Structure formats: structure tokens, C-alpha cells
Amino acid sequence: MSVPLVEQPVRMTLKQVVDYLNAGIAEAEVFLSPARSSKLQMEQCVALDVLSYNATRVKHEAVRRDDENAANLFLGFECAIGAIRSELMMWILLKRDMPNEAWNRLVAAQMGCLDATRAHGSFADCERRLKDLEKLESQIFPPQVFLSAGFVANRLDCSICGERYSKCEHLRGKPYMGQFCEVIHRNPRADHVAMVKAPADKRCRVVSFKTKDGHRDRLSWEISPYRDDEVFKDDDALEVESIFLTADRYPYMVPTEKILGPLTS
């Protein structure tokens, strides 16, 4: 791996750190193709783990200096690095014949690009990358049935200040000193689930549906046989397996090993 660990990032100038992070991203982008070696792609993912770690270190240093612009800049780098890493993992997982896991990495890459543009104005290139990923979605994956779940909560709090969201000045999705404002739902309760065309989270979707032969996966189209206690009736309503809620708001931040397993030689 050619991305070194920055032992003392505080001794580097802002330009040096930015150049270092951009160089690591540019090197990884060379491998954004299904034709590239999976082994080399995985090595790049691990290199991006290191790059992300260093971006986080310099972000924390900016926070200690009370430099909000720099903190938000490096938050953007965390998002952009995570997006590239997620896209690399998507290709690896597709080549492993794991389309559902690959779909989640594609969505993570899209979320990372979008968050990078929200974090700081220096990531306009991520807007172009997001459009490319949306095109890639329709070229690689079949159309999906998306779901959206509605919830009610006792109160909504701000993740930045901890106050009621309706009374504070922070805005959801905006960066503040290196972190995004999120709304925390206190004591949430499910209200409804609906099929939608444009979900807030594309990971929420119909995963499989029942056929006379078993559960058919909507991505791989493979059929999993029924368990002994399962039955299928032609006159019944359509039964599906679905995901209608995800807990991880920042899936692109997940390190390589947790998704792909350990790097083997």
C-alpha cells in the first residue's frame, strides 16, 4: 500500500494535507473498474482506511483549533474517501457474486458523495461523481421496489446541541465544526410503511418475494427453497421479504474489513 500513515499531521501545512489526501483519492480512482484485479482493489480499500483515519485526525486537530472551515473540509474528505472505498467494494462484491451486498455499497457511495458536497464547497467534483453513480445504478442493477417507513416520536432532539430540534438554530444535514446535524427521535414508534419511487434511503427495499418454488431474490433472481414450515398459495396476497429501516446513517464510514473480511495474500 502506498498511502503512508501521517504520524504528525499538525506539522503539515493545510495545503500539504489536502494534497496528500487528494493524491490518495486519485490513486484509488484508477481502480474503479470491474476489470481491475480484486486483490489490488481490496488493497486500495485498505489504503483508503488509512487515508480516512488521517483525515479524521486532522479534522479533530482543526476542531481543537476552533477552525470550523477546516473541520468541515476534512469532514468532506472523510465522506469523499468513504465514497470511493464503497464503490471499490461494490465491484469486489459483484465479482464475488454478492449483489445484495454490492447494492448496499453502491448506495453507501452515493450517500458519501452527497454528504461530501454538503460538508464543504470544495467537493463540487462529488456532484459529478454522484451523477455517474446514479447512471451506474441503472446500468448494473435491475429496477428496485423501494420502501419508506413513517414513525412518530415523543420528541425530536438536535444531535449538535441536544436541545429540541424545533427550538435550536441548527439545520439537519448541515455541517457544524466537523459533524453533520441530525435529528434524534426519542422513543420512536412505527406508524406506516409505503412503497415509494424516491426513498430517503435506497437500502430500504423489497429484497425477495414468494413464488411457488421458493423465495426469489430481486437482484440475483436466485430462488431459496422454503423452510419446512413455509407454504405458498397462489390465491394469497404477495408476500415479500423487505428492509424498511436501517440504523447506520453513514455506511460509507465502515472500514474495509467489516465489509469484505480480512485482506489475504
Question: What are these regions, as identified by a protein language model?
Answer:
Residues M1-S265:
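Signature of dsDNA virion morphogenesis modules
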